[in-house]
A protein has these predicted regions:
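Rossmann-fold NAD(P)H-dependent dehydrogenase/reductase core
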Residues: 1-144, 235, 241, 245
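Glycine/proline-rich active-site loop of Rossmann-fold NAD(P)-dependent oxidoreductases
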Residues: 55, 143-147, 187-192
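Surface-exposed beta-strand-to-loop junctions
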Residues: 23-27, 95-97, 157-160, 203-209
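Alpha-helical membrane-targeting segments
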Residues: 98-104, 137-139, 143-175, 211
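Intracellular terminal tails of multi-pass secondary transporters
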Residues: 218-220, 224-250
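Pocket-edge positions in alpha/beta enzyme catalytic cores
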Residues: 34, 169, 215-218
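C-terminal/domain-terminus segments
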Residues: 124, 132-146, 194-215, 247-249
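C-terminal helical subdomain
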Residues: 160-211, 222, 228, 232, ...
Length: 250
């Protein structure tokens, strides 16, 4: 952070993915690797930039249509019992899912937590633009590479080139996915505090406000609960690092 001398206009938070075999492994922060990779660094980066007055305009947080679900593909919407701080914390350390941890399912819940943190930040910092965007189902990325081999093969060589184009509104090129980010940053039609992604049940096409059909996104208490849960792990990680330094003499 000390090397950033000039204020930054735009930050795109695109770190993350399904991770792969180590997704459930617990990190020093207390989050599992899936949550830490998708959330931890993003949150710390943005909040440190704000603290140092080094962020001028926009934060774009990358989410996914997996949050509201895609019925045609059998992807169910994220459905939490209470969206309490404790429940979000259980998502972030993986205990929410019990012994049968499925990284693809957990990914949607982790993205929901990151999305809700972003929406909470939009209310906390009204002079900045905090917008959430899904790039949609985009060809030509390395996103499938962390999937199990059979699923990776099906997605890359069957679903993407053959099945999705036949279904309509389910896939697009890398340029189209990137344009979603550019539009959300530069076009005033896209407002702070909103999650924009494909129309309900789709993975491509026009972007719409997801809260029109996934109403939990509007719940400000849920948003703040996600924020509080994330900071539980940030504070734990900082304490852990401090304690480790004392024991090692650093």
């Amino acid at each position: 952070m000390e090397k950033i001398k000039e204020p930054i206009d735009v930050v795109i938070l695109n770190a993350g993915g399904v991770i792969g075999k180590t997704a459930a492994k617990i990190t020093p922060s207390g989050m599992n690797e899936l949550a830490a990779t998708n959330i931890l660094g993003n949150v710390i980066l943005v909040e440190e930039l704000i603290k140092r007055d080094n962020l001028r305009k926009t934060v774009l947080s990358v989410s996914a249509e997996a949050v509201p679900g895609v019925k045609m593909l059998g992807v169910k919407p994220v459905s939490m019992r209470t969206s309490s701080v404790d429940e979000f914390a259980a998502v972030l350390d993986g205990s929410y899912f019990g012994k049968k941890f499925n990284a693809l399912q957990a990914y949607a819940y982790v993205k929901y937590a990151e999305t809700m943190w972003t929406l909470s930040m939009a209310r906390k910092y009204p002079k900045l633009k905090f917008v959430v965007v899904s790039p949609g189902n985009t060809k030509g990325t390395q996103a499938p590479d962390s999937l199990p081999p059979p699923m990776r093969f099906m997605l890359k060589f069957v679903m993407m080139p053959i099945v999705f184009p036949l279904m309509g509104g389910m896939v697009h090129t890398l340029d189209v996915g990137a344009k979603r980010f550019v539009d959300a940053i530069s076009d005033e039609r896209y407002k702070s505090g909103v999650f924009y992604a494909s129309k309900e049940g789709k993975l491509s096409g026009d972007m719409v406000d997801q809260s029109t059909f996934f109403t939990d996104l509007k719940n400000t208490s849920f948003q703040d609960n996600a924020n509080d849960a994330i900071h539980h792990f940030i504070n734990y990680g900082q304490f852990f690092a401090s304690a480790q330094g004392k024991f090692t003499g650093n």
